[in-house]
Amino acid sequence: MMYHIPDVLSADQVAEFTRQLAQAEWVDGRVTVGNQGAAVKQNQQIDTRTPLYARLQAAVLDALRGHPQFFSAALPRTISAPLFNRYGPGETYGFHVDGAVRQNAEAGWMRTDLSATLFLCDPESYEGGELVIEDTYGQHRVKLPAGHLVLYPASSLHCVTPVTHGVRQASFLWIQSMVRDDKQRATLYDLDRTIQSLKARFGDGEEVLSLLNMYHNLLRQWTEV
């Protein structure tokens, strides 16, 4: 399943990110991928050895950890250190699949259940640069407002189409979920959204508490911690 998570960053936060990204040191994006990815990757990434990178990735992690919809959809056990990329005119990233495991400074090796892209530019500010994700239903072209995030299975083939005008900037990261199975995780997400909607309309009635009990029993059955 693919999810659009709105307003991970506020407009003020996006403006601050834009200001700081203008001061960043950028390096060839191929330094973070293997041979398969390097053959189709043409972009730039922020140098992860700089103090600016440390501040930006910490800000993204704080925003994600405080976003209820992201937590409900991802059920994160481990979140990788966010990276930041930039695509200028002519730059692109051809179809590829993300590696199944990654090294993480805090957790050692982590399994990549989910991939996420947090858009940092308004879609009107650049042309091209769509994130294209393939699944069993076909191709999905994603180009979200600044501060919004797309979350999708890391097993999906995906690409970034060539930017033809302007600059596309984003943060990207991976999540190891407490619930490994995509269908089980989607069931829990749908159930949680239903519970939250019913609570907003009717309060904590008997039926809502029954669904909440069901949610936690399923989570207890399916989770890996």
Swiss-Prot record:
Main EC class the enzyme belongs to: oxidoreductase
Cofactor requirement: Fe(2+); L-ascorbate
Pfam family, one: PKHD_C
Keywords, comma-separated and alphabetical: Dioxygenase, Iron, Metal-binding, Oxidoreductase, Vitamin C
InterPro entries (UniProt xref): Oxoglu/Fe-dep_dioxygenase_dom, PKHD_C, PKHD_hydroxylase, Pro_4_hyd_alph, Pro_4_hyd_alph_FE2OG_OXY
Enzyme Commission numbers on file: 1.14.11.-
Metal-binding in keyword set: yes
Gene3D superfamilies according to UniProt: q2cbj1_9rhob like domain, Rabenosyn, Rab binding domain
GO biological process terms held by the UniProt record: DNA damage response; intracellular iron ion homeostasis
Record SMART domains: P4Hc
Amino acids binding 2-oxoglutarate: 168
Domain Fe2OG dioxygenase: start-end pairs: 78-177
Chain positions recorded as Fe cation binding sites: 96, 98, 158
Binding note for cofactor: Binds 1 Fe(2+) ion per subunit.
GO molecular function terms listed in the Swiss-Prot or TrEMBL record: 2-oxoglutarate-dependent dioxygenase activity; iron ion binding; L-ascorbic acid binding
Protein name (Swiss-Prot/TrEMBL): PKHD-type hydroxylase KPK_3192
Source organism (scientific name): Klebsiella pneumoniae (strain 342)
Lineage of producing organism: Bacteria, Pseudomonadati, Pseudomonadota, Gammaproteobacteria, Enterobacterales
